[in-house]
Amino acid sequence: MEVTVNRRKWGIISLTGTVGFFFAIAPVLDPYIVIEIGSGFTLKINDVIMLFLTMLCFSKSYRFERKTGFLCIWLLGLGLIGIFGNLASNTDMANSFKNLIVWLIYAVCLTYLWKTPCRDKFLQWIEIIAIIASILVILQFVSGYVGIGMWDGRIPGLALGKYDGWAGYIDVNTGDIRPNGIFQEASYLGIYVSVAYVQAFKEEKIKRMLLYAISMLMTTSVVAIIILVTTTVLILIMKLSL
């Protein structure tokens, strides 16, 4: 009897950990695709993983959250406004319907996945990925200035969409060193690492804070620097007010 209970608990923890890992790794995998047909249909790696995990979670609990339905109604309303706007501007109606359907599916799947108890695992994976990305940023920064070849962060063997590009850690237009870690652009890294930075700040992990702050500054991304300064000031104000 104990073995059965342990197996069930292990299964729940495993699924929870997988969902948390998916939410953490999704921003890294976002630009990569499985298949692209013309300019109207693109199936991303994240889409496949999201649908698969949603089916696994749904097989354990069939309950449909009220807030999910509320979100869908809002998205449907915004989508209809967009469609009416297309009617006025004579733009592609089929593409608008496709986008509306896709975002409704995303709303259902992501809110359903997020209700699983995956927050702790999500934050753990965020920290691990942020540390790896930050270390890579420092290596890219040093390599760029020394003139040594370095991995640009793009995952080998995975394809990008037709209209997507990979910025790399050297700006092709200006030649500036703008480390991007394992993200498509330097600003995306700044946004992602800021989550780990806030978490480290709250837990007073000084070494991690410094690592994240250095990597965000090295990107020279305006977005990353603004987020770094803003979050630091806000957290200090909150701590002083307590």
Task: List the model feature ranges, each with a label.
Residues 54-65, 110-119, 199-206, 233-241:
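Structural signal for the C-terminal ends of transmembrane alpha-helices
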Residues 145-166:
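Juxtamembrane non-transmembrane "cap" segments at the membrane-aqueous interface
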Residues 1-62, 80-86:
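N-terminal signal-anchor transmembrane segment
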